[in-house]
From Swiss-Prot:
InterPro entries: L-Ru-5P_3-Epase (IPR004560), L-Ru-5P_3-Epase_Enterobacteria (IPR023492), Sugar_Epim/Isomerase (IPR050417), Xyl_isomerase-like_sf (IPR036237), Xyl_isomerase-like_TIM-brl (IPR013022). This is L-ribulose-5-phosphate 3-epimerase UlaE. Belongs to the L-ribulose-5-phosphate 3-epimerase family. Its EC number is 5.1.3.22. Catalyzes the isomerization of L-xylulose-5-phosphate to L-ribulose-5-phosphate. Is involved in the anaerobic L-ascorbate utilization. It comes from the Bacteria. GO terms for molecular function: intramolecular oxidoreductase activity, interconverting aldoses and ketoses; L-ribulose-5-phosphate 3-epimerase activity. It is an enzyme of class 5 (isomerase). Pathway: Cofactor degradation; L-ascorbate degradation; D-xylulose 5-phosphate from L-ascorbate: step 3/4. Keywords: Isomerase. GO terms for biological process: L-ascorbic acid catabolic process. It catalyses: L-ribulose 5-phosphate = L-xylulose 5-phosphate.
């Protein structure tokens, strides 16, 4: 029987850098996490994962089986560099090829959810054409994901195009496909002028996972928990009352810290205390 416990995961970039997934998953287990979210960002090193050999993919599957710590999701931020809305046909084609490879990779190793970055373009100026190309690129991507039975889930971003659940729902309704859902980040959601609880309630039925981090207006990364504007207890309580039973992922970038494990343990305890106050988990 599956546990009724709320699944709590940690972002890969919170843990020490490196390519040994067995070591990473063992550490995550020691720290009390149920799963790790993989990052495929715009760096050549992490993009290279999409070209892993059969043996490398099997090694990841084996590490999951040995440790019992899952890798159910991928944060695919590589589209900052190769955006689906690019007006350069070659760049856009590369973005679609990255999507194809990511979906194939997910299918091979058991990743169920690919979190998408909601940028039509990132390093260029957005306009009506980039938004149109982005929509068309999403449609093509969701068609690929449907055939592979892999869910694409849109993150709520640090970018105006996708800075609320309401805006992301517009894309969900446009695509009208069960393999396209939402993956809100309560930090990003709170950093904008959103009615956060109303937004979370609006997304119920489409939310497949939740990123947990703190933010300040205009500051979307590396804000220590408790020093930002996020009302964690209210967010957790709203999600619980709305019937959300899915995973929560602590998002941090402590892989280059002097002691990443200690940083993660501190954040884990802080977040779990707020979860307990909201009735999501039992108090320690």
């Amino acid at each position: 029987m599956l546990s009724k416990q709320i699944p709590l995961g940690i972002y890969e970039k919170a843990l020490p850098a490196g390519e040994c997934w067995l070591e990473r998953l063992r550490l995550a287990k020691t720290l009390g996490f149920d799963f790790v979210e993989m990052s495929v960002d715009e760096t050549d090193a992490r993009l290279a994962r999409l070209d892993w050999s059969r043996e490398q993919r099997l090694a990841l599957v084996s590490a999951v089986a040995e440790t019992g710590v899952r890798v159910p999701s991928m944060c695919l931020s590589a589209h900052r560099r190769f955006p689906l809305g690019s007006e350069d046909d070659a760049v856009r084609a590369q973005g679609l090829e990255i999507m194809r490879k990511a979906i194939q990779f997910a299918q091979d190793v058991g990743i169920r959810v690919i979190q998408l970055a909601g940028y039509d373009v990132y390093y260029q100026q957005a306009n009506d054409e980039t938004r149109c190309r982005f929509r068309d690129g999403l449609k093509e991507s969701v068609d690929m994901a449907s055939r592979a039975q892999v869910t694409l889930a849109m993150e709520i971003m640090d970018y105006p195009l996708m800075n609320s659940i309401s805006k992301a729902l517009g894309y969900a309704h446009y695509l009208n496909n069960p393999w396209f859902q939402l993956y809100p980040d309560i930090g990003n959601l709170s950093a904008w002028d959103n009615d956060v609880q109303m937004e979370l309630q609006a997304g119920i039925g489409h939310i497949v996972a939740v990123h947990v981090k703190d933010t300040k207006p205009g500051v979307f990364k590396n804000v220590p928990f408790g020093e930002g504007v996020v009302d964690f207890e209210s967010c957790f309580a709203t999600l619980k009352q709305s019937g959300y039973c899915g995973p929560y992922l602590i998002e941090m970038w402590s892989e280059t810290a002097e002691n990443p494990a200690a940083e993660v343990a501190k954040a884990r305890d802080w977040v779990k205390a707020r979860m307990a106050s909201a009735g999501l988990v039992e108090a320690a």
